[in-house]
Amino acid sequence: MTQAQNYVIPPGSKVLVTGANGYIASHIVKALLDLGYLVRGTVRTPMPWLAEYFERQCGLGRFELIVVSDFQQPDAFDESVKGVSGVIHVAQGLPSSTAAETVKSATAYTVNGVINLFKAASTQRTIQRVVLTSSIVAAGYPTGKGFKLDADSWDESLEQASKDGTTVPIYRACKIEGERQAWKWVEKNQPHFELNSVLPWLTLGKILHPNIGGSTMGYVSGLLRGDTTPFKFLPLPWFVDVEDTARLHAIALLNPSVRSERLFATAAPFTWGDVIEILKRIQPNNARIPAAPIQEEPTLGDVVPAARAEKLLRETFGQLGWTPLEVSLESGIARE
């Protein structure tokens, strides 16, 4: 990464990462530890295996866990924000039984968690930056060729649904409102900290520990066992490697040129045919890998801010560019 004296937050400082046992969050923790930071991670229940993992990887005394079981409590984050210089809010605050929830109550649940964290952070003058993990769906999920997303794009499906009586998937609705209300809260309350967000698309790549859910990489790994569930992801998404996504979170936290910005973690379009071809090349004797869908086409368009994110990865971490699909898949199925 660029020289430490340029960081907004100096190495050796402590950073809070929520939902530290998650697929993306665990990579963010590792990226920060590798850069010389101390990390406090929140989990909903005690997870000693996670602390043991990072101690083995990065040394004693550099990573600590704190249990935050209910984001809905107004004081949920009061203890966890003490003594930290930055916050990365990754944990998706969803009700435990989302199928039984209305979209309205589910989004309120998510937004409450975000606002409770922001309020707690605003009481700690040591906190200089807060980074929110959003999703590409907050900007607007493309439906076909020729789409264009820019830094000011917002998904309008919730507004449309209220007009025509349709429903929006809960995950999508929560990501839209979670990020939108985060920016509105900052605009209204003018806290001392700066806010940036990161919007990943379909995230692939290495899973750090067997106890960490593989999220979208888990679906793709299922193809090795003949599970064709990923073929239902339509229109076809773009992919991004999980380490690239984690590094963009670090950039959003530390890079002085990234201010009140949305970083789009979107590498390139792909087809499931591309994925199947790569998987068969990696495991040529695996007869359970299914045939690719017929007549599929990549979702071609323009994610304008992706060029900015790729440039930041090159400048900050010395990467040649986005991690290629094949490299991401190889690392993602290494345990399979």
UniProtKB/Swiss-Prot annotation:
Highest taxon of source: Eukaryota
Protein name as catalogued: Ketoreductase adrE
UniProt-listed Pfam families: Epimerase
InterPro entries: Epimerase_deHydtase (IPR001509), NAD(P)-bd_dom_sf (IPR036291), NAD(P)_dehydrat-like (IPR050425)
Alphabetized PANTHER family for the sequence: ALDEHYDE REDUCTASE II (AFU_ORTHOLOGUE AFUA_1G11360), NAD DEPENDENT EPIMERASE/DEHYDRATASE
Pathway membership, UniProt: Secondary metabolite biosynthesis; terpenoid biosynthesis
SUPFAM superfamilies for this protein: NAD(P)-binding Rossmann-fold domains (SSF51735)
Keywords: Oxidoreductase
GO molecular function per UniProt: oxidoreductase activity, acting on the CH-OH group of donors, NAD or NADP as acceptor
GO term, biological process aspect, one: terpenoid biosynthetic process
Effect of inactivating the gene: Drastically reduces the production of andrastin A.
Function field: Ketoreductase; part of the gene cluster that mediates the biosynthesis of andrastins, meroterpenoid compounds that exhibit inhibitory activity against ras farnesyltransferase, suggesting that they could be promising leads for antitumor agents. The first step of the pathway is the synthesis of 3,5-dimethylorsellinic acid (DMOA) by the polyketide synthase adrD via condensation of one acetyl-CoA starter unit with 3 malonyl-CoA units and 2 methylations. DMAO is then converted to farnesyl-DMAO by the prenyltransferase adrG.
Species whose genome carries this gene: Penicillium roqueforti
The protein's Enzyme Commission number: 1.1.1.-
